[in-house]
Amino acid sequence: MIEASKLKAGMTFETADGKLIRVLEASHHKPGKGNTIMRMKLRDVRTGSTFDTSYRPEEKFEQAIIETVPAQYLYKMDDTAYFMNTETYDQYEIPVVNVENELLYILENSDVKIQFYGTEVIGVTVPTTVELTVAETQPSIKGATVTGSGKPATMETGLVVNVPDFIEAGQKLVINTAEGTYVSRA
């Protein structure tokens, strides 16, 4: 069992009614009067729906045991993403709604880790940084420096990242997948 105060982004737990929930955001909130509460943005792993809720810090949940296996992203068709276990060559279908954020960081044939809850595939873990090519951005401004506020750039996967002014379309960039931010040129 894990207390609500110990839940952090990325953790998965099971509710009393059997729902498998992943924490997207968690923060302590101390109202002017009364006790501290935990405000959380959560995702139902099975349905993909997200919702905001709050818990008392002492509330307890059953922490889900999640196993991961190495895999490769194959392709996306309609509302399904296809992955292959690189050890057993088994293929898995995951609804896009469950991995839509992760798909912004990976290209076909990218290495990932598939997450299992028992025998049920529940998600995908992407590397901490990935290399993506800039598909579209505003033209560079002569004399632009790194200290500027930056500009939006659309990557080849559709991800929009704020980049320095000197970045141009066609350049490969290193992107932090946890924050969705520019790290450096590749």
From Swiss-Prot:
Q: In which pathway does it act?
A: Protein biosynthesis; polypeptide chain elongation
Can you say where in the cell this protein is located? Cytoplasm
One annotated Gene Ontology cellular component of this protein? cytoplasm
Single GO term (MF):
translation elongation factor activity
Its primary localisation, in coarse terms, equals cytoplasm
**What does the entry give for GO biological process?**
peptide biosynthetic process
State the UniProt keywords alphabetically.
Cytoplasm, Elongation factor, Protein biosynthesis
- Transmembrane feature ranges: none
Fetch the Pfam families from UniProt: EFP, EFP_N, Elong-fact-P_C
- Give the superkingdom in one word: Bacteria
N-terminal signal peptide:
none
SUPFAM superfamilies found in the cross-reference section: Nucleic acid-binding proteins, Translation proteins SH3-like domain
Q: What does this protein do?
A: Involved in peptide bond synthesis. Stimulates efficient translation and peptide-bond synthesis on native or reconstituted 70S ribosomes in vitro. Probably functions indirectly by altering the affinity of the ribosome for aminoacyl-tRNA, thus increasing their reactivity as acceptors for peptidyl transferase.
**Similarity annotation:** Belongs to the elongation factor P family.
What protein name applies here?
Elongation factor P
